[in-house]
Amino acid sequence: MPHSDELDAGNVLAVENLNIAFMQDQQKIAAVRNLSFSLQRGETLAIVGESGSGKSVTALALMRLLEQAGGLVQCDKMLLQRRSREVIELSEQNAAQMRHVRGADMAMIFQEPMTSLNPVFTVGEQIAESIRLHQNASREEAMVEAKRMLDQVRIPEAQTILSRYPHQLSGGMRQRVMIAMALSCRPAVLIADEPTTALDVTIQAQILQLIKVLQKEMSMGVIFITHDMGVVAEIADRVLVMYQGEAVETGTVEQIFHAPQHPYTRALLAAVPQLGAMKGLDYPRRFPLISLEHPAKQAPPIEQKTVVDGEPVLRVRNLVTRFPLRSGLLNRVTREVHAVEKVSFDLWPGETLSLVGESGSGKSTTGRALLRLVESQGGEIIFNGQRIDTLSPGKLQALRRDIQFIFQDPYASLDPRQTIGDSIIEPLRVHGLLPGKDAAARVAWLLERVGLLPEHAWRYPHEFSGGQRQRICIARALALNPKVIIADEAVSALDVSIRGQIINLLLDLQRDFGIAYLFISHDMAVVERISHRVAVMYLGQIVEIGPRRAVFENPQHPYTRKLLAAVPVAEPSRQRPQRVLLSDDLPSNIHLRGEEVAAVSLQCVGPGHYVAQPQSEYAFMRR
């Protein structure tokens, strides 16, 4: 039955009275209630809200992916205009018909690329499969198009990436592959569920620009789900604000930002970290927290100095970490990924040193190398006056009491078969620090310290939200009273309010226990808020390092300026200068085996502020 008359002119999607529920303990739990919206051709609708507000399940309902997961979906109308201009009722399509709709007419970019990509197929095969299915292309034509899409999403060495498997790529690289796959068939509607959360600011800016270009070329409608209000201001035409499963406010992006009506919308905007908000301040400052009663209430600032004078707790000198690449009939090592090249820095007790840079710049590898989670090929790592890069495995285990790691994905770093109490107790058992009764009391204290309840110790990881799981990982890292915590993108996937709570918790713990943080992040607004010093990494080397205030208020290196210029601004009407993005020819950190990369030479430009010298910088960036 044709539905053309039911869809208003210009609309590509229309939803009326969408209700979504799930069964839990024989009770129906409502996830979305009476949601209605429309999407015009060529328009971007941003759906914003905190975790659990119903954003993602709405997207899954549109793709008809909820029913097989036990979701109960009811809707008066769910109309889609296909690329052929045929209008269909999505709720009436059977499974076979939806397979032709997904990918060709509606595509979705998921938040977690590792769970969305098939681990047994190469990246090229997975992108080509969609192209062959929906465009009737040959295998050769599909692979050529797959490489073109990888080039479009700014993946260097695209031809090499085609033959790699998902686990061989970084998180940011996998997300770009997902985006390339979704855009490869040029759908009528693109649903993007937190597509740039795991990406650094420059790649995020380029992806947003790419989506805009393709949207204009094809008059594609885009539903953009995000918690980043800077991205909303950057890309959205209209905004739909969701809270506890309901739409509480909708309007143009200018109306939402300049005249928000609902208390939750005002609270959400008040909690957005603004780049430049720390201007003139020397020390870290707490985030404001979302409050419906007091939307603009500011959390108490931290202005006291937490850095302890004396010797650094951690010294790194000329650290080198490379990964071999094999090729040829004999599978010999012919090339190497120069992940970290002659990196040096100090970390003082009570200090937060942030490592920033693009995906693939060597930030995470540097953090992992400090704990010997990856082997280094050169350099020195000195902790409390003792070299740890040459320690035996037995002595290294004892050292790990003092240096702990918080990983980006809390769900992947917690054993799903263990209660969270057992996960927190495990480090205490491994190091033989506390007997069972004392360990249980320690777990209860740690859970309370990170804002959870002692009775939560008996629950499993899947019973917690993302923010709660990250708190559990922090509690586990604190169990051994470490002197240093390495936090690798610990808050990048969390929404605004949860992120603020976690950052405030880290600052409180630093104040109380004098912990030193190596904070690895691509979120420049968060880095500005939490850091004492900042080190900027580019292709495995530090090109600028100094006090946070100096680096943010007076950036000297062109790469640092590019990172700051790429940060989205949560102000839709602000006239921003044209962004300075990286050149189209992205340098590669893959070199022939035995080839040495010229090390940058840093010169002092201010108190504690060092920048790569122009001549070595030029040679390095051109290699």
From Swiss-Prot:
Enzyme class at the top of the EC tree: translocase
SMART domains in UniProt: AAA
Biological processes, Gene Ontology terms: glutathione transmembrane transport
Chief place of localization: membrane
UniProt domain ABC transporter: residue ranges: 15-269, 314-564
Membrane topology: Peripheral membrane protein
Molecular function GO labels: ATP binding; ATP hydrolysis activity; ATPase-coupled transmembrane transporter activity; glutathione transmembrane transporter activity
Any Pfam family: oligo_HPY
EC number: 7.4.2.10
Residues annotated as binding ATP: 49-56, 357-364
Annotated control of activity: Inhibited by verapamil but not by carbonyl cyanide m-chlorophenylhydrazone (CCCP).
Recorded superkingdom: Bacteria
Reaction equations catalysed: glutathione(out) + ATP + H2O = glutathione(in) + ADP + phosphate + H(+)
Entry keywords, A to Z: ATP-binding, Cell inner membrane, Cell membrane, Hydrolase, Membrane, Nucleotide-binding, Repeat, Translocase, Transport
A cellular component term, taken from the record's GO annotations: membrane
Keyword Ion transport: no
Places the protein is found: Cell inner membrane
Protein's job: Part of the ABC transporter complex GsiABCD involved in glutathione import. Responsible for energy coupling to the transport system.
Family: Belongs to the ABC transporter superfamily. Glutathione importer (TC 3.A.1.5.11) family.
PANTHER family tied to this protein: GLUTATHIONE IMPORT ATP-BINDING PROTEIN GSIA, TRANSPORT ATP-BINDING PROTEIN
Record note on quaternary structure: The complex is composed of two ATP-binding proteins (GsiA), two transmembrane proteins (GsiC and GsiD) and a solute-binding protein (GsiB).
Protein name: Glutathione import ATP-binding protein GsiA
